[in-house]
Amino acid sequence: MNFDASNDRPLKKRRFFVDDPLDTAVTPAEKSPALDASSSASTHTDPNYSANGSPAQIQTQQEYNFSNGGHATQPATAAGTRTHQAQSPAHDTLSDFDTEAFVSIVGEQVSPETLSQIRKLSDGSLEKAINVYFDGSWKNAGSPGSSQTTLLSCERNASRPSPLHTSREQGTGPAENGADSVTEPISRSKLQPARRYLGAFGVEAWATRSGIGLIKHGDTVNIERARSQPLSTRGRTGKLRVNQKGDVLTRFTNTAGQEIGRLPRETAEWVSTLLDQKICEFRGVCVFAPDRLRVNDTIYLQLRCFMRIEAFQPKELPQKQDDNRATTIFEQEESAEEKQLRLRQVALVQLFDEIGLKSTTQDDEIKKQRKEGLLRAAEMADQEAKKLAKSGNTDSGDEEPAELEQDQLDALYKKAQSFDFSMPEAQPPSSFAMDLRKYQKQALYWMLSKEKDKKSGREVSIHPLWEEYDWPLKDVDDKDLPIIEGINHFYVNPYSGELSLDFPAQEQHCLGGILADEMGLGKTIEMLSLVHSHRNLPPTQSLGNLTRLPVSGVVPAPYTTLVVAPMSLLAQWEGEALKASRNGSMKVLMYYGNEKNVNLREMCSAGNAAAPNMILTSYGVVMSEHRTHQALAPGTSWTPGNLFSVDFFRVILDEAHIIKNRRSKTARACYDLKATHRWVLTGTPIVNRLEDLFSLVRFLRVEPWNNFSFWKTFITAPFESKEVVRAISVVQTVLEPLVLRRTKSMKTPEGEPLVPLPKRTIRIEKVELIEQEREIYNHIYTRAKQTFNSNVAAGTLLKSYSTIFAQLLRLRQTCCHPILTRNKAIVADEEDAAAAADQDSDLKDDMDLQELINRFTATTSDAESSNEPPDPSMKFTAHALRQIQTESAGECPICSEEPMIDPAVTACWHSACKGCLKDYIQHQRDKGVQPRCFSCRADLNPQDIFEVVRYQSPNTTPTEQTPSSIGGDNVYSSSQPPPPPRISLRRINPLSPSAHTSAKIHALLAHLVRVPAGTKSVVFSQFTSFLDLIGPQLTKAGISFVRLDGTMAQKARAEVLAQFTKFETFTQEELDQAESTSAPSGLTPTPKTPKQSSSPSSPTVLLISLKAGGVGLNLTAASNVFMMDPWWSFAIEAQAIDRVHRMGQLRDVNVVRFIVKDSIEERMLRVQERKMGIAGSLGLMGEGNEEERRKERIEELRLLFE
């Protein structure tokens, strides 16, 4: 009978059926020579053997001899002797190999070459030699891909101790001392034998064979793996996939290598892990077995566990960890390495529980709580893995990780935001050129205390993640065990499965933290004050005294702070750093683009007096250089001078929520940056999940919370188990010592606001789509709703979520401009056709009125000068255009309204109200007749109807006046009339698709033309293609603007921000004159010298994409914000608004959010309310199960399609 394909024990068969044919069993008589030989060998080898000892006692002594190379039954007198025996057991035991006994047992002649090979593989053990021979593993022992069913001697040999590397996923190595570049050998492993007894436990195994005399009381059995399947396999794309069907079959065999039975699944699940990962070896003794054995009978075994030396040697994870990224879009799916760690830690916890091994450093209650938490976290991970395997990852929509509600976030921040206003203040040094507010000085004091809190005199204590265990002194039979001098304890990290013989000391706690002040409170300035206040100054030395650097390895950079920020903020950091520093007190290096061609190892070394004080770089550069750093082969004799070759004095991550995904390449790169002090700047430490905070804690290397297994045990698992209050309480404990957070809504004890900011007004303006836009919107909406209804009926709503979401995107784009939903190639062809038509016609989409008057007047003058008869049409055209210019066109010939309302002009230059003219043409077309001019009866083409657009006169501001004109010394100051306002004729229905305006663009222009002089505005949109359409309309309206989006290089972004944030500066005389001529209210220019008043005026509008400019930027030069389209979460929009309404803003801020009436955008506002918790759900009752979250998402979709 074959049981290889089954993991579970078969059901008991009924006894009255005919028994299976009995296998030919080895009779006691046939076995006796081997047993006698083995027994005699054991008796001869073991001086402590008693003549009346039981077989179990004999086996116990054999195991001790086996585990210590045959020479450790008596404690050695010198450590050196024990070290030699542990390292070379084969050398001492090969001479004891009984060849005659081996040949007699196997029953056939064996060649000398084969015999020699088997002796080497078995380390001279007759028992192992028999197993090796019968299972055939000696034939392919050298093949790396062979499947082993028994433990070979090559696995038992203690390999050479490797340097102590600690996985960064745990970040809690037993001997880490803060210097990642220093590696020390595991010295105690040289004293440790290849195997050492740990304990014993009983198990009820089951038989897989039938027979008589197969096994009896006292017989020795070998515990082996039936076969071992890899935890990860390569998929079609070449990427590693986690094998969710882990094989746990564990068999036991007799001394002849025959399989007798298997361990029960509940035991095999963790025993197989310990065998596969070479942590333990098990030897079994039969306690009870039926004389007549049948399949599925219960066999009682006593298993003795021996810890292998390999278990104490660190495991190196693969370098290319990014290949293990799961195919799902969510970050919670575990990788192959994480599954190995999970199985290892669970196996060790179960083993220690079975053998009754207790930690010496913890009481029973704490031990119990830790065990329960570990097993619960592991069980949740296992259930998640099985669920993903069952679904095949085809529908990841239901697997979205639980998110935090707004009130839960408020609860998390409650302790962090309980700011002590009586905290002492710290004054920055004289090299710092700015004046700090009180709360900023308090922040400086807090940051200095975090960085300088070394506590070097404290006593050494064990690492909080590790537990200490004593090696047992007696075995299960109360016999004395060998004592290894100097190794009385071993240490276990149950959260990572690591083991160590060296004492894992508690490392220096985090010398940094999280500065989480709300956006706009000046985190950048606070951090710059810290850079000035706590830094090492390079010594003044000549070039000849420079220290020679090694060609490889990491070099310390004691004078340099590294700042990692989004590309858009690099220029702002550079400007703020120089602005906040006295001349010559700060050297800033921009490490980006072509400026990366420097060797940081040499530039930032301790011997370089010219080392930069601050290096600015982007997250993209860090990720790119980390890839190069990982590609270097281990032991490379050369190290490139990049960011990972330097141990910085301080590392600062700005907008650090970028690394919230712990498995992203950017996050992994940032984890590997080396620095003494580590800081995180973010206004949102937790975006929407608890694991967002873990990534920051891991970067800061806050122990023990930077261990993900520990985090899952005490935070993630309780939260997912609906113990939300407990999980939040633990997170508050983590946050309290790490985070400093103040908000703009805080008030001082005197009742004053923490930061006095001007008033902010947010107004929603409903926009009505024009008829053509509404038709397009209704068409797309109908298709989207049909798709939604059909999927609801079929029950496949979430499987088609991406399709529905794409149609929602089209609806949102239609609200902005219909052209955004059209095929780009077709639009480009229409643009070319419109341009060609403009070239062939005298009528353009947009014509300047003054240029038309000049052209027709010149034609009439030329005719008069040449004595030709004048063209009456030319004279009429010039006259009609002048009437439009002087606004004296009279009453409307259609409605008799005087003056005309929004005058429009036909191609024959007759004027009427725009609304009247459009209705007149539509009336003619409804009657089925060709529209004709209401005045001259000429044919009317709807494409050739022009509206009159009047632009405001150039604003008269102090910057446009010279001091001489103000003082009256210029004789032309009062005689020069102001330039006339610009007027243009613009097609109502342009030929060019991009020239068409939309309801939102029209509403935006209506606001911008009413903006007071000297006031700047910021226009946000998440669609850069929409910004492409807004720009030309601003140009036509005579509004100067600049643009910033994600496609621009860093230097171009810096130039745009410099132009937009540039303020005009005036003299005192100019200010007095401005006040006397009703200067715009709220204008607060800075008095400067007269020569600065001649600088050209800066743009008044900044077009910016929501993603590129939503965070970090300082846009206080503006006071008007226009949000062209809503986002799913208002928090994203609030971040963008806070770029303007922040510290440094002197004017009231007006925010207008354009929302299309009766559209998807109005329903998005209701979704925002749900996400903000306004809908009434407290959320403290837990996130619910998957079915509840599924219903919630379906309800949101229903809300969008009401």
UniProtKB/Swiss-Prot annotation:
It is an enzyme of class 3 (hydrolase). Signal peptide: none annotated. Residues 504-703 form the Helicase ATP-binding domain. GO terms for biological process: DNA repair. Residues 1-90, 137-187, 382-403, 952-981, 1071-1097 are annotated as: Disordered. ATP binds at D517, E518, M519, G520, L521, G522, K523, T524. A zinc finger (RING-type) spans 892-937. Coiled coil: none annotated. CDD domains: DEXDc_SHPRH-like (cd18008), SF2_C_SNF (cd18793). A motif (DEAH box) lies at residues 654-657. Residues 1084-1097 have a biased composition (Low complexity). It is found in: Cytoplasm; Nucleus. Residues 37-90, 143-152, 952-967, 1074-1083 have a biased composition (Polar residues). Residues 1-10 have a biased composition (Basic and acidic residues). It comes from the Eukaryota. Residues 1003-1198 form the Helicase C-terminal domain. One of its GO terms (cellular component) is cytoplasm. PROSITE patterns: HELICASE_ATP_BIND_1, HELICASE_CTER, ZF_RING_2. Keywords: ATP-binding, Cytoplasm, DNA damage, DNA repair, DNA-binding, Helicase, Hydrolase, Metal-binding, Nucleotide-binding, Nucleus, Zinc, Zinc-finger. GO terms for molecular function: ATP binding; ATP-dependent activity, acting on DNA; DNA binding; helicase activity; hydrolase activity, acting on acid anhydrides, in phosphorus-containing anhydrides; zinc ion binding. Its EC number is 3.6.4.-. InterPro entries: Helicase_ATP-bd, Helicase_C-like, HIRAN, P-loop_NTPase, SNF2-like_sf, SNF2/RAD54-like_C, SNF2_N, SNF2_RAD54_helicase_TF. Belongs to the SNF2/RAD54 helicase family. Probable helicase, member of the UBC2/RAD6 epistasis group. Functions with DNA repair protein RAD18 in error-free postreplication DNA repair. Involved in the maintenance of wild-type rates of instability of simple repetitive sequences such as poly(GT) repeats. Seems to be involved in maintaining a balance which acts in favor of error-prone non-homologous joining during DNA double-strand breaks repairs. This is DNA repair protein rad5. The gene is rad5.
